[in-house]
């Protein structure tokens, strides 16, 4: 029935409201016509390609955000390191032009490691442990060479004396120069670790497992008692003895068993065992370990150097090898000179042995 207009009296048909409310079923009524073409509104649909691109962008954004947080954390952590810059000129560090030229293209990085027991902030301390850490990417190895601290060498400006005196005289720069000049090395970086907190780091790792002879056990227990160290005695000897932090430090500092060469060997054993234990701990413990080590360390290495070496060491599956100087091939002897005991040996022969070990010059490779 047609509805009547109350003002004009005309009648008109009532529109179909239900169909008008559905804009798509009445699309012809709302379509825009231009010439002979009719354009209709329709929903936009994303293509599969566009969805993939958007998803990848979101994932990339999340990765970049996480990477930024991790990078900021690492930078903040590395800021705990004490920094001591070294001269950039190789000759200033005692590196000869011949040595620099010979090894410039080899992917082997040598870093001096100094262990000191300095309990005061202004105390440089003698290098109680002196080692060369070699990052050998050519043969995928980490090599650790310890040099006896009583080695008789020439120290620039001070004459002939013990090699560990160089660190006490003028710090790491002179110590590195002394190693380079006496062993034809090309060391341009160093890390110094304060041994005063070494026991705490080992305890954080859960202790270490190490070979201990019966003589070493007896001497260590005597030192524990004499020095009043608050720890349990070492109860057994053998190929794998579990040591706490204090026990391990006493073990490494034992000067009464086998002389200085065996003492440096014990120091290498402790460091090697710490390295193995550090790889075995849960990843959630790494931040605490890193904080403990860095807070007791000083270095000349940049953040990029540290990150590069650390990443390679963890991911490369590199094996660790060790050597000490002097050894049975160096014609070494203990001598008293001007009332002081020194390790005297053929430095030229020792240099050849050191280079063969680090660079594997005489290997089949």
Annotate each language-model stretch with its function.
Residues 165-232, 302:
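Amphipathic, coiled-coil-like alpha-helical scaffolding segments used for oligomerization/assembly
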Residues 203-282, 364:
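Flexible, polar/acidic helix-loop-strand segments at domain edges
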Residues 1-42:
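N-terminal targeting leaders characterized by basic, low-complexity, disordered sequences
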Residues 117-122, 161-169, 184-189, 253-262, ...:
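Second-shell loop/turn segments in exported
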Residues 106-109, 125-130, 137-147, 158, ...:
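Extracytoplasmic
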Residues 94-101, 120, 151-155, 159, ...:
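C-terminal solvent-exposed extensions
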Residues 2, 7, 43-139, 308-310, ...:
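Entry/capping segment at the start of metal-dependent catalytic domains
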Residues 123-127, 157, 166-174, 192-196, ...:
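Soluble non-cytosolic domains of exported or imported proteins
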